[in-house]
């Protein structure tokens, strides 16, 4: 997997005047358990939707932490499936057709995962866009988004309030059906038409390369390709079992983050704990703290992450 994203990690909370909101913990939230009630299966499914249908029967899921190590959101796979199914009808209510591309600014939060799987159930194709703006690089980031929107032929776009102005500016001259925040899509009326049953030969998502040496190249991933890769990672590469727990700070728009820490845990029915990439860059110790706190058994990163810990983390 390419490691080009490491050159673009941002540690600021404001870019070109747009504030990227940081979630605050208001109520006590319990993390999903490590022990699952469902028998472990090593991604022996035909499609991602079949994998989520199975994972949803257990109690495991995804958890999201602030830079201070406090959990601010938790989403079981059962809740994810239910919410993704509901959202899939709302996306189809826009008049989107099977095979249409939906651009998702891939921040490390539950909304990206909800929309990614909603697209799977609706027969739409999610395209993960980078959520990474270097300070003073407003124009360059907008240009990058515009090129990705054009290259992917996206018909709708989703971004948080912090990133929406960039995405709207990038889509100004494009014929897109809707570009808005997640809440606006959730508020749409649903379409009650039967959902498309995903087939192994259907396109699941489009993954763009890092583009560290040239403009990012889109790779079309079909369900059968994704599942073969995931099964190899889970069964042969990581040799996972039902007692594992994962932890990651890698961005969702990067292949190692999307495949390794969004798709793998769900297809293995294990819980995962997330720390935002920006928060890791500011507080690398938190990666180590959270692995200890959650008793994670699996976490990996490019060499940059270990180097940052070695340089910035000092014994207490």
Annotate the PLM regions.
Residues 63-117, 134-141, 192-198, 221-224:
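Conserved AMP-binding/adenylate-forming core of the ANL superfamily
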Residues 3-75, 79-94, 98, 164:
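N-lobe entry segment of adenylate-forming
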Residues 106-109, 116, 130, 249-257, ...:
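Conserved AMP-binding
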Residues 109-134, 144-156, 244-245, 263-273, ...:
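A short helix-loop-beta submotif of the ANL/AMP-binding
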Residues 37-46, 182-203:
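Flexible, low-complexity linker/hinge segments
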Residues 60, 189-215, 225, 229, ...:
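Conserved pre-ATP/AMP-binding loop-to-beta segment of ANL
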Residues 228-245, 255-297, 308, 312-314:
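Conserved AMP-binding/adenylation subdomain of ANL enzymes
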Residues 6, 10-15, 93, 121-189, ...:
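Structural core segment of the AMP-binding/adenylate-forming
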């Amino acid at each position: 997997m390419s490691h080009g994203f490491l050159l673009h990690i941002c540690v600021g909370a404001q870019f070109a005047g747009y504030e990227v909101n940081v979630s605050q913990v208001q109520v006590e939230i319990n993390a999903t358990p490590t022990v699952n009630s469902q028998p472990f299966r090593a991604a022996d499914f035909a499609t991602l939707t079949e994998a989520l249908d199975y994972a949803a029967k257990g109690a495991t899921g995804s958890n999201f932490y602030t830079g201070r190590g406090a959990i601010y959101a938790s989403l079981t796979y059962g809740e994810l499936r239910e919410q993704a199914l509901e959202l899939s009808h709302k996306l189809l209510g826009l008049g989107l057709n099977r095979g249409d591309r939906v651009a998702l600014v891939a921040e490390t939060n539950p909304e990206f995962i909800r929309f990614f799987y909603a697209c799977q159930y609706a027969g739409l194709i999610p395209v993960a866009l980078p959520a990474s703006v270097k300070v003073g690089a407003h124009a360059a980031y907008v240009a990058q988004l515009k090129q990705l929107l054009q290259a992917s032929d996206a018909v709708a776009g989703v971004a948080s309030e912090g990133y929406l102005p960039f995405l709207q500016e990038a889509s100004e001259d494009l014929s897109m059906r809707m570009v808005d925040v997640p809440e606006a899509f959730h508020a749409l009326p649903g379409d009650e038409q039967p959902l498309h049953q995903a087939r192994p030969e259907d396109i699941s998502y489009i993954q763009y390369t890092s583009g560290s040496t040239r403009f990012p190249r889109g790779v079309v991933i079909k369900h059968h390709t994704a599942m073969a890769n995931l099964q190899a990672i889970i069964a042969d590469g990581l040799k996972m079992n039902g007692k594992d727990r994962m932890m990651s700070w890698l961005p969702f728009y990067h292949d190692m983050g999307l495949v390794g820490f969004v798709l793998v845990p769900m297809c293995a029915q294990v819980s995962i704990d997330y720390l935002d990439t920006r928060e890791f860059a500011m507080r690398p110790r938190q990666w180590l703290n959270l692995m200890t706190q959650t008793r994670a058994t699996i976490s990996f990163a490019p060499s940059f992450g270990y180097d940052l810990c070695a340089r910035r983390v000092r014994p207490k």
